[in-house]
Curated annotation (Swiss-Prot):
Residues 251-261 have a biased composition (Low complexity). GO terms for biological process: translation. This is Small ribosomal subunit protein uS2. Signal peptide: none annotated. It comes from Syntrophotalea carbinolica (strain DSM 2380 / NBRC 103641 / GraBd1) (Pelobacter carbinolicus). Belongs to the universal ribosomal protein uS2 family. PANTHER family: 30S RIBOSOMAL PROTEIN S2 PROKARYOTIC AND ORGANELLAR, SMALL RIBOSOMAL SUBUNIT PROTEIN US2M. NCBIfam families: rpsB_bact. One of its GO terms (cellular component) is cytosolic small ribosomal subunit. InterPro entries: Ribosomal_uS2, Ribosomal_uS2_bac/mit/plastid, Ribosomal_uS2_CS, Ribosomal_uS2_flav_dom_sf. Residues 233-267 are annotated as: Disordered. The gene is rpsB. Keywords: Ribonucleoprotein, Ribosomal protein.
Amino acid sequence: MAQVSMKQLLEAGVHFGHQTKRWNPKMKPYIFGARNGIYIIDLQKTVRYFKSAYQFIRETVQNGDKVLFVGTKKQAQEAIREETARADQFYIDNRWLGGMLTNFATIKKSIERLKKIEVMAQDGTYELLTKKEALNLEREREKLEKTLGGIKGMNKLPGAIFVIDPKKETIAVKEARKLGIPVVAVVDTNCDPDDIDYIIPGNDDAIRAIRLFAAKMADACIDGAQAREAAIRAESDKAETDKVEVEGKGEAPAAEAAEVVESADKA
């Protein structure tokens, strides 16, 4: 299992929370103290809770599900896109549309529309349209790509969502909870941890902190995918071995029967 060290957390500024006047009292158990009017997050607890979150994400992917990364704040967008591409997962980095999960059937129609326009752009259909029609289609494609590009391949609901700043992504968290989809989130000192299934106490504003956690959760996805592939290969190898053994057992009685027939003929 990939670990996160205290050194990595300190270098990324994960321990810096919000100003003491901007906090959620429910985060008190995860706060070490305050310095110059800024809450300091207890990194020992960050390490402990990170391990649980990592293991859960790994198991989710190992079981065949995908993880939806959600980070629409500017500091999170690039890291979310890059890490989900590396781990072959899904993401929302621009704006969370209401019903993205709870009304997924409608969202899927928009995704299909996006895919259809992309095909039209590639197969020469644009060239058969007027300049205005082609321009309108391209604008529609760009708009859909901006909002839904990160979930184009998502044919079913995710097995979990990983959120940067659940206070900002309130709607996403509420939809996931309504559907029973587990929520993993980086939770800063101004957030409500009660709505999160697997919290990771930490700075959700610093780019380095966000990138660290996005990369680690992507690693968890990759670990889970590799474990799943290994299990499938092992099962396939076992099935092949069992097949060979069964065929071998079938050949032995046939050979014995042939010997009996041959002996009878000689007699």
